[in-house]
């Protein structure tokens, strides 16, 4: 598995397994809605009244319609990005 997909695959797989409705926003602003039926390295099959094959390079954002648990399907911790930022403020307050 490629390093860049270590979060993407479990996220999409949890959406698929739990049949979570999603809104997918494309880079051109179009909003698609449905459920993730399947996915691979390059595309997501989005099912609504019809199935649509959406190329990942055209996707800006995937927004789940309800909360779901990614960690139940992915047990390894999130890697710390290069530079060591962990989301916490390193500055000390005086």
UniProtKB/Swiss-Prot annotation:
Entry protein name: RNA-binding protein Hfq
Matching InterPro entries: Hfq, LSM_dom_sf, Sm
UniProt keyword annotations, A-Z: RNA-binding, Stress response
Organism, as annotated: Shewanella woodyi (strain ATCC 51908 / MS32)
Keyword RNA-binding: yes
Sequence similarity: Belongs to the Hfq family.
SS bond partners: none
Lineage, highest ranks first: Bacteria, Pseudomonadati, Pseudomonadota, Gammaproteobacteria, Alteromonadales
Keyword Coiled coil assigned: no
């Amino acid at each position: 598995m490629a390093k860049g997909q270590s979060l993407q695959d479990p996220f999409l797989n949890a959406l698929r397994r739990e049949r979570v409705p999603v809104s997918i926003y494309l880079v051109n602003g179009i909003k698609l809605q449905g459920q993730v039926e399947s996915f691979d390295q390059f595309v997501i099959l989005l099912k609504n009244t019809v199935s649509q094959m959406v190329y990942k390079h055209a996707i800006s954002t995937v927004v789940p319609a309800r909360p779901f648990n990614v960690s139940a399907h992915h047990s390894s911790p999130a890697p710390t990005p290069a530079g060591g930022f962990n989301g916490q403020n390193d500055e000390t307050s005086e």
